[in-house]
Amino acid sequence: MDLPEPLHDFLLVFLGSGLILGSLGVVLFTNPIFSAFSLGLVLVCISLFYILSNSHFVAASQLLIYVGAINVLIIFAVMFMNGSEYYQDFRLWTVGDGITLMVCTSIFVSLITTILDTSWHGIIWTTRPNQIIEQDLISTSQQIGIHLSTDFFLPFELISIILLVALIGAIVVARQ
């Protein structure tokens, strides 16, 4: 979007805080329905980030697929489950939680240091998207593919990692 810089910065901070609060709600709420609604807030904030970065197609896909389908499916699955059996053995803190916290914190710190130490300006893409998109012979689906592999490479990879984690989580839940 072509917004004035102070408004753009305000929206970035607002969406970032909504994203952080929603993700904390997903993890910290003991009621699974509240966690699912917090996940919906996180996914909506991510799609609004895509709108701010002028990738409206990815934002619409995010809203339709994740918020409209996946999150609603999660809410229905949680509503059909018997929740009383999960709260009988509830403990506030275990040794496994501490180990998980240490591992996740170390991964988070290593990712932050890697992101801050990387010179992102030195990355050279093999194709320049402006040169390719100016050609009239390329169809719309090819333009989307070029954008996904050049301009939106990092968000596309992050979405694939989120899908992988969701698949692994679904397998773990299905085995129990």
From Swiss-Prot:
What does the subunit section of this Swiss-Prot or TrEMBL entry state?
A: NDH is composed of at least 16 different subunits, 5 of which are encoded in the nucleus.
Species of origin reads Glycine max (Soybean)
Physiological role:
NDH shuttles electrons from NAD(P)H:plastoquinone, via FMN and iron-sulfur (Fe-S) centers, to quinones in the photosynthetic chain and possibly in a chloroplast respiratory chain. The immediate electron acceptor for the enzyme in this species is believed to be plastoquinone. Couples the redox reaction to proton translocation, and thus conserves the redox energy in a proton gradient.
Membrane-spanning parts: 10-30, 32-52, 63-83, 92-112, 152-172
One GO MF term on file is: quinone binding
- Thylakoid as a keyword? yes
The reaction(s) annotated as catalysed by this protein in its Swiss-Prot or TrEMBL entry are: a plastoquinone + NADH + (n+1) H(+)(in) = a plastoquinol + NAD(+) + n H(+)(out); a plastoquinone + NADPH + (n+1) H(+)(in) = a plastoquinol + NADP(+) + n H(+)(out)
EC number(s) on file? 7.1.1.-
Return the protein name.
Answer: NAD(P)H-quinone oxidoreductase subunit 6, chloroplastic
Q: What class of enzyme is it?
A: translocase
GO CC, sorted alphabetically, is: chloroplast thylakoid membrane
Output the InterPro entries linked to this UniProt entry: NAD(P)H-Q_Oxidoreduct_6, NADH_UbQ/plastoQ_OxRdtase_su6, Nuo/plastoQ_OxRdtase_6_NuoJ
